[in-house]
From Swiss-Prot:
It is found in: Membrane. GO terms for cellular component: membrane. GO terms for molecular function: DNA binding; DNA strand exchange activity. Residues 17-168 form the Resolvase/invertase-type recombinase catalytic domain. It is a single-pass membrane protein. The keyword Membrane applies. This is Uncharacterized protein y4bA/y4pH. Keywords: DNA recombination, DNA-binding, Membrane, Plasmid, Transmembrane, Transmembrane helix. The chain crosses the membrane at residues 386-406. InterPro entries: DNA_bind_recomb_sf, DNA_bind_recombinase_dom, Resolv_N, Resolvase-like_N_sf, SSR_resolvase, Zn_ribbon_recom_dom.
Length: 694
């Protein structure tokens, strides 16, 4: 039987050491349930009574405060298992099975190793030998009951939590800006600065529609955002620092700011290292969602609009995502294009061209998902120009409303930022004054405390001075946004909106934002023409067509009339003269540049036109060398005769190169044209040779 201790403990067991495993599930149990801990340590006396010397009874208590649901992170249990596996343990002591493990996998692995190494296991009920089937079956049953006990406890706790959550009464950690009252009601934080800062975040997102834009604006205006310390030193205190993108997304996704109670937004899972991680759960799978459960900063309808906007801002390849948030890049219709063939979202692709990026609208859904081919693509500039022209036509009646909206938005933004900076400055003054009073109350002889308080006072004064300078600088910058010249520029929208739209200082992001106020989406169908179907806000549609952009090979092609004119001019002029004549007539190449001799030469070679030289040679013209051989003189003499007009010549290149007309049956009169005077050289008809008598 399992209680027959004398039979089970033998000399081989006593030769090895005894290991006492002590564990409590939480630190709270360690401090409050001290009697249970004492009972576990008292098992050392049981081991001594069985014959183990006290110095060979090892206590493993490094797992105090850790749950027994798994062996991960329980260094003490892992050390115990390794000692059993190596045969160093003669007996393992634990108050009950639940102290060793509440997980069947860990428990049965320990039993298997104990059976192989002939290690005994002892609890408060008796001694067991896992090598015996009956003892092993009993230990296995105890392990199963221990795991079931944990499951039952968890189920009861979870059921109570869920039942309370369904009533909306479960107290959960609240985000910054919300607090609990003494009667467990959720209200807005009474700190006015915290309230105004949270409201500013939602107002900024309402204006910009982008989490990144919220971060840029708050950081640009030096607005600090609060964060409450959840645990550790300073728990409950509020820290103020610059906001980041992840923090903005957390706030925008949190339904508590819309006055809703939500439970089950995340679930716990384990990664490859068996570390618990929190995973987001889709809203349709939340266990509890109670709208209008308490006061909030925004309405539930606005919360849902924010979620839809954030989803549309995503730039991934998931179906339905369009990435509508205006980003850098000249593609005006970014995030609003739909393919007229397959209905998928069209994306903007940029290619370098002449030192800048040229946009193309591409439907690459088949390429991404099925390694197929592009559905359709088109150069973006003609489409953007057509949509811009239509937008300017539609915007003319609404220009006054736009100007008033812009002016109101700027004024509201400046006033909100100034008010928040004022509260930050007021808080900094209070903290500096509080540090001063602390310093003045300290005993001057207690230099350790006095020096620390003096350093804290100086730090508060430096922070106050930096905030004061930043506040003054921002006020000057805000004044430039509201002065009379700025007001005139805003009012100019009513009379000259097209000029402002086309102004180089109006960035691509601003144009896209204005376009998004009027246009819902644009569908493109590239055929013989580019068919553009525009769906306006409100559901009205409008269609237009633009000529399909020509291929680059066609764009670069020299017009046929220019090629014919060059061919005609080559009969009497060279490349330089032809270039000058083309420029006089107003002709330009495909880039709009004037013609040069080199460009004329490229056209001539591309189209196989004979050069001026080839045409003169075909007409019988001779080179200077050929004329010199015919006249029996040197080539320099021929050039001299050409310059003086004695020989007729024709220029065929720009570097003073000529071809000569055949001189015919003539010869150069000897003695004429000497270097030092004499008659001018002249050509005379050569007399035929007299035939002698045979």
């Amino acid at each position: 039987m399992s209680t027959d201790i004398a039979i089970k403990v033998d000399a081989d067991h006593l030769r090895r050491d005894a290991f006492l495993y002590v564990r409590q599930s939480s630190l709270r149990q360690v401090f409050e349930n001290t009697e249970s801990t004492k009972r576990q340590y008292a098992l050392r006396d049981r081991a001594v009574a069985l014959g183990w010397p006290i110095e060979r009874v090892h206590v493993i208590d490094s797992d105090l405060g850790l749950s027994g649901a798994q062996s991960q992170d329980r260094d003490g249990f892992q050390h115990l298992v390794s000692e059993v596996a190596m045969g160093h343990a003669g007996i393992v002591l634990g108050l009950e099975v639940s102290r060793l493990a509440r997980n069947n996998a860990d428990w049965h692995r320990l039993l298997e190793l104990a059976a192989l190494s002939r290690t005994l296991i002892m609890d408060e009920d008796g001694v067991y030998d896992p090598a015996y089937f009956n003892d092993r079956m009993l230990l296995g049953l105890k392990g199963t009951m221990s795991e079931a006990e944990l499951h039952i406890l968890k189920s009861r706790l979870q059921g109570g939590i869920l039942n309370k959550a369904r009533r909306g009464e479960l107290e959960m950690p609240l985000p910054i800006g919300l607090v609990y009252t003494p009667d467990a009601r959720v209200v807005l934080d009474p700190d006015r600065q915290i309230q105004d800062t949270v409201r500013l975040l939602f107002d900024t997102f309402r204006q910009t529609g982008s989490a990144c834009a919220v971060v840029r604006r708050l950081r640009g205006e030096k607005i600090l955002f609060p964060r409450r310390i959840r645990r550790g030193i300073g728990k409950g205190d509020v820290l103020w620092n610059e906001i980041d993108h992840s923090r903005v997304l957390q706030i925008l996704h949190n339904p508590r700011y819309a006055g809703a109670f939500a439970y089950g937004r995340t679930r716990t899972a384990y990664n490859a290292k068996l570390k618990p991680v929190q995973l987001r759960v889709a809203r349709s799978d939340w266990q509890v969602l109670i709208p209008d459960a308490h006061d909030g900063y925004i309405s539930w309808a606005e919360y849902e609009r924010n979620q839809a906007a954030l989803e549309q801002n995503a730039t991934g390849f998931s179906p339905g995502l369009r990435g509508r948030m205006p980003r850098q890049g000249s593609g005006l219709l970014q995030g609003r294009l739909l393919c007229g063939r397959c209905g998928a979202r069209m994306r903007v692709h940029y290619e370098p061209f002449e030192g800048r990026l040229r946009p193309y609208y591409v439907c690459n859904e088949a390429v991404v998902r099925h390694a197929g081919k592009h559905c359709q693509w088109v150069r973006g500039a003609p489409v953007d120009e057509a949509v811009s022209a239509l937008l300017l036509e539609v915007m003319a009646p609404a220009a006054i409303d736009v100007a008033l909206a812009v002016q109101q938005e700027i004024t509201q933004r400046v006033e909100q930022a100034a008010a928040l900076r004022g509260t930050q400055l007021q808080r900094a003054r209070y903290e500096a004054e509080l540090a001063r009073r602390r310093y003045l109350k300290v005993d001057p002889d207690n230099r350790l405390v006095a020096d620390a308080l003096e350093a804290d006072w100086n730090a508060r004064l430096r922070d106050l001075d930096a905030l004061q300078r930043e506040h003054e600088r921002q006020n000057e910058a805000d004044h430039s946004l509201l002065d009379e010249p700025a007001q005139q520029r805003i009012r100019a929208l009513t009379a000259d909106f097209p000029r402002i739209w086309n102004d180089e200082r109006t960035g691509a992001v601003e144009r896209k934002r204005m376009l998004g106020l009027l246009i819902e989406d644009v569908t493109l169908l590239v055929d013989d023409e580019v068919n553009i179907n525009i769906r306006w806000r409100g559901g009205r549609t409008q269609s237009l067509s633009v000529a399909r952009p020509r291929p680059m090979s066609v764009i670069r092609k020299t017009p046929a009339q220019v090629v014919a004119l060059i061919n005609e001019l080559l009969e009497a002029t060279n490349d330089r003269q032809i270039a000058a004549r083309l420029n006089e007539l107003g002709h330009r190449n495909w880039r709009g540049e004037p013609f040069t001799p080199k460009k004329v030469m490229l056209v001539r070679r591309t189209y196989g036109l004979k050069s001026r030289y080839e045409r003169l040679r075909e007409g019988g013209m001779l080179t200077g060398e050929e004329v010199a051989q015919q006249l029996g003189v040197c080539e320099s003499t021929v050039h001299q005769l050409g310059r003086k007009g004695t020989l007729k010549r024709h220029r065929y290149a720009s570097n003073h190169r000529y071809l000569y007309e055949p001189p015919g049956n003539v010869r150069l009169e000897k003695g004429a044209g000497s270097r030092y005077g004499g008659r001018q050289p002249r050509l005379i008809v050569a007399q035929p040779l007299q035939q002698g008598a045979s």
